[in-house]
Amino acid sequence: MIDHVILTVSDFERSVAFYAKALGPLGITNYIDYEGQDGHPDLKGFGDGKRAFFWLKEGKPDPQAVHVGFVAKDHAEVDAFSKAAVDAGGKSKEAPRARHEYYPGYYATWVLDPDGHDLEVVHKG
């Protein structure tokens, strides 16, 4: 099980605005600053209201090295993420659709964030 992911982004403000809008349809709406004992003022976190598990760190991104997949509860949530992410400035890589070549019930979309990170949202029904 994965506890958290940290993406390096080139512009905090732009990326925080993008992810706040794009992840909202997935119920990932909690934006917080890291407040651990060891500092890290350069971390901004998103979560589900219980804990932060998706973090942004400002620096020099390497988007070719990153693919992050988020879980959606149904097809409508996949579609809503795709629209919200593109409306927030992301670039559609692949529109929402069934991917039976992966296996039956796989429905997903892919969007590139403002730095080019490859984001997937999938419902496995």
Set out the residue ranges of the language-model regions.
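Core segments of cupin and vicinal oxygen chelate
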Residues: 8-51
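N-terminal beta-strand motif that seeds the catalytic metal site of vicinal oxygen chelate
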Residues: 1-16, 68, 125
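Conserved catalytic-core motifs of GNAT/GCN5-like acyltransferases
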Residues: 27-34, 97-100, 122-125
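Short beta->alpha transition motifs characteristic of CBS
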Residues: 5, 103-104, 110, 121-125
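Short acidic/glycine-enriched loop/turn segments that link adjacent beta-strands
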Residues: 37-40, 62, 102-105
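Long, continuous compositionally biased terminal/linker segments
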Residues: 40-73, 77-82
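Vicinal oxygen chelate
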Residues: 10-13, 70-114
